[in-house]
Structure formats: structure tokens, C-alpha cells
């Protein structure tokens, strides 16, 4: 396993650990999710380029589309919660029920 793959795997695990440990604020959770998606994108792109899989070259772009949709939904939820309650705690999401 090369050093670049190990760095991307470490970035993914650190983002996952940050998501598990700092889950009280929504902004930190969203940043950790974006770090996980970015490291997955880079790892998938490197694997596809190194193995010369031309048929799977569309998969990282599809992952980026899902990451952009996740970021847009997360930011809209963050804006809605912060304008309604004045803080971005994840525990306030239980109060959004109809």
C-alpha cells in the first residue's frame, strides 16, 4: 500500500472519528461528512487511474454529485435550524417534527 493511499485512508478515518466524537454541533458534523466524501473521491479516483479501469471512470463523478446534494441538503437544514432556534445543536433536530 503506497503512502498516498495510506494518507487518504487516514483522512477518511480521522473524518469518521471526528463525526463520531464531535456530533453535538451540526456544522462540525457536516464538515466531517464532507471530509469523508472528499477522501473517498480521491481514493476512488486514484484506484481507477492506477488500475486503468475505463469503464468505472464515471463512479467518482457520481460520488461528487451525491456529495453536492448532501452538502446542499445539510446546509439548508443548518440554516433552517439556526434561524429557528438560534443555535446549531444536533439535538434540536428532534424539535423539527410536525
Swiss-Prot record:
Reactions it catalyzes: a ubiquinone + NADH + 5 H(+)(in) = a ubiquinol + NAD(+) + 4 H(+)(out)
Query: Which EC number applies?
Result: 7.1.1.2
Supply the enzyme class, top level.
Answer: translocase
Signal peptide residues are none
Name the source's superkingdom: Eukaryota
Among Gene3D superfamilies, the record links this protein to: 1.10.287.3510
Q: Give the disulfide map.
A: none
InterPro entries, alphabetized: NADH_UbQ_OxRdtase_chain4L/K, NUOK/Mnh_C1-like
A Pfam family: Oxidored_q2
Membrane-spanning segments = 1-21, 29-49, 61-81
Per the record, membrane topology reads: Multi-pass membrane protein
UniProtKB keywords:
Electron transport, Membrane, Mitochondrion, Mitochondrion inner membrane, NAD, Respiratory chain, Translocase, Transmembrane, Transmembrane helix, Transport, Ubiquinone
Where in the cell does this protein reside? Mitochondrion inner membrane
Q: What does this protein do?
A: Core subunit of the mitochondrial membrane respiratory chain NADH dehydrogenase (Complex I) which catalyzes electron transfer from NADH through the respiratory chain, using ubiquinone as an electron acceptor. Part of the enzyme membrane arm which is embedded in the lipid bilayer and involved in proton translocation.
- Subunit structure of this chain's protein: Core subunit of respiratory chain NADH dehydrogenase (Complex I) which is composed of 45 different subunits.
Name of the protein: NADH-ubiquinone oxidoreductase chain 4L
User: By which gene is this protein encoded?
Assistant: MT-ND4L
